[in-house]
Amino acid sequence: DLECPSGWSSYDRYCYKPFKQEMTWADAERFCSEQAKGRHLLSVETALEASFVDNVLYANKEYLTRYIWIGLRVQNKGQPCSSIYSENLVDPFDCFMVSRDTRLREWFKVDCEQQHSFICKFTRPRR
């Protein structure tokens, strides 16, 4: 596996980076995806990954907003949550964030138009 770019943290086969800029959920997702192919707002797949990301956020908490966007959102009423990006958000309260104070132990469903810091994730390229 190749290393993560400068400024990005590495765990397993992924790279992570929190950004202090305050954006809406859609703008933050767009920002992540424009950095390079395959980059998106954070999705968490295991408890160990959550613990790693928790430490990344804690190490950067002094310059992040209190709440940080993650990639989780509700797609449609009655459907399961999804971490796949779509601009067709039905309800303005369909986006999720975490608090830097409670770390990843609590997720909050809020208005997608709020502006917060965010964390991007992507799979490291293979050689």
UniProtKB/Swiss-Prot annotation:
It is found in: Secreted. GO terms for biological process: venom-mediated suppression of platelet aggregation. Keywords: Disulfide bond, Hemostasis impairing toxin, Platelet aggregation inhibiting toxin, Secreted, Toxin. GO terms for cellular component: extracellular region. InterPro entries: C-type_lectin-like, C-type_lectin-like/link_sf, C-type_lectin/snaclec_domain, CTDL_fold. The keyword Secreted applies. One of its GO terms (molecular function) is toxin activity. Disulfide bonds join 4-15, 32-120, 95-112. It holds the Pfam family Lectin_C. Expressed by the venom gland. Residues 11-121 form the C-type lectin domain. Belongs to the snaclec family. Binds to the subunit GPIbalpha (GP1BA) of the platelet GPIb/V/IX receptor system. It inhibits ristocetin- and vWF-induced platelet aggregation in platelet-rich plasma by inhibiting the binding of vWF to GPIbalpha. Heterodimer of subunits alpha and beta; disulfide-linked. This is Snaclec CHH-B subunit alpha.
